[in-house]
Amino acid sequence: MSRLENLTSKIIKDSEEKAKIILDEAKREEEKIMLGQKQEGESIKSKIIEKAYLESKNRKERIISNSHLFVRNRKLEAKQEVIDKVYKEALNKLAKLNKEEYLNFIKDSILALEIYGDEEIILSQDEKYINKETIEEINKELKSKGKKGEIKISDKKRDFRGGFILNKDGIEINNTFEALILSLKDDLEPVIIDTLFS
């Protein structure tokens, strides 16, 4: 029996050694896997942190850029409001010309135009100074310049602040105060901006 016990004892011992080897190998494999997982986790963590950093940096830059754009647009809007007020004030001053200044402006404007002298003059619905006598004076001066001198006041009235529109065969020359200011706008805007905002 002692031989049987020795054999059994040896089998048990061999089994325990094999089990220990298998367990040690399993433990090393587990550590290897854990190390790989840890390294992969660290790599993923680094990538996530880097991505978050880049996204936050880009977001910050977008916010700053949008802020600059917003401020610039507000400045432009404010400048445009001031410019619009300047034009409105200019229009108001033209509309408040006294009778003599206004009629001289109308006469000088018509006489300076390259026209035939037989156009129809369309006036503002609020016109208070231009009448037949005014047109007769203008016609006399047109004749003295070799033109027809047959301008007539139109029955049509339009909605504008002052000035006039000359019409012949459907072609109009717009000399209203609004049109004059608008035509000068491109030339005057840089001057106004320099004067007001420099």
From Swiss-Prot:
One of its GO terms (cellular component) is proton-transporting two-sector ATPase complex, catalytic domain. The gene is atpE1. It holds the Pfam family vATP-synt_E. It comes from Clostridium tetani (strain Massachusetts / E88). SUPFAM superfamilies: V-type ATPase subunit E-like. InterPro entries: ATPase_E_C, ATPase_V1_Esu. Produces ATP from ADP in the presence of a proton gradient across the membrane. Keywords: ATP synthesis, Hydrogen ion transport, Ion transport, Transport. Belongs to the V-ATPase E subunit family. GO terms for biological process: proton motive force-driven plasma membrane ATP synthesis. GO terms for molecular function: ATP binding; proton-transporting ATP synthase activity, rotational mechanism; proton-transporting ATPase activity, rotational mechanism. It comes from the Bacteria. This is V-type ATP synthase subunit E 1.
